[in-house]
């Protein structure tokens, strides 16, 4: 955990539904941060039924990184939320759902999103080191797969990016202090 650091400031009133749901993903990321985990958060929002009927968008699942806490390489925010959403809906197909995540999904998470048949993915910050929704490769829109997801990126980019930057700066500072001790 980064001690003594201010939490990123976020606009008090989101202007769009995407911003409102991304704010909830940021809240999830802060839970990871409080555990000393990489601050990545995710929510899954159902927007329509399997029959295609539009419904009032509702959060059906939340997740945040817990890899270190659980000693589990699969405990990413997206995987946790996808598992919960499948349980809520009683089906592995998450058609009619949008995934909101503070950092661009890695290859594993992008693959799970495709397998779950999600309609859309909304990303806060892109991930130049492991991003699989356009930064390094784009598994979410790979035409050879049987499913592609629409991507919206950059929703509340600044607070999402700042949270990651401050987290890793804190890790580097702690390592430097340890070496100098």
Regions found by a protein language model. Give the residues of each.
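Short loop/turn microsegments at loop-to-beta-strand junctions
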Residues: 16-17, 38-40
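Short hydrophobic alpha-helical segments used for membrane anchoring or interfacial signaling
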Residues: 43-48
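A short, polar/acidic, helix/strand-boundary loop motif
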Residues: 15, 67-68
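Zinc-dependent deaminase
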Residues: 1-32, 49-54, 105-181
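A short, polar/charged loop-to-alpha-helix boundary motif
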Residues: 69-79
């Amino acid at each position: 955990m980064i001690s003594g650091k201010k939490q990123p400031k976020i606009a008090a009133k989101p202007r769009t539904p995407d911003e409102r749901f991304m704010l909830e993903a940021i809240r999830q990321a802060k839970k990871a941060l409080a555990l000393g985990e990489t601050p990545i958060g995710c929510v899954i929002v159902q927007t329509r039924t399997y029959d295609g009927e539009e419904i009032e968008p509702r959060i059906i699942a939340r997740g945040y990184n817990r890899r270190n806490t659980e000693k589990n390489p699969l405990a990413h925010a997206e995987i946790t939320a996808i598992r919960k959403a499948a349980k809520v809906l009683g089906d592995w197909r998450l058609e009619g759902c949008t995934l909101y995540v503070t950092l661009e999904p890695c290859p594993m998470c992008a693959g799970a999103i495709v397998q779950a048949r999600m309609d859309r993915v909304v990303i806060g910050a892109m991930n130049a080191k492991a991003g699989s929704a356009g930064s390094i490769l784009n598994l979410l829109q790979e035409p050879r797969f049987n499913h592609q997801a629409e991507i919206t990126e950059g929703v509340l980019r600044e607070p999402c990016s700042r949270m990651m930057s401050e987290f890793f700066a804190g890790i580097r500072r702690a390592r430097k202090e340890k070496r100098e001790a």
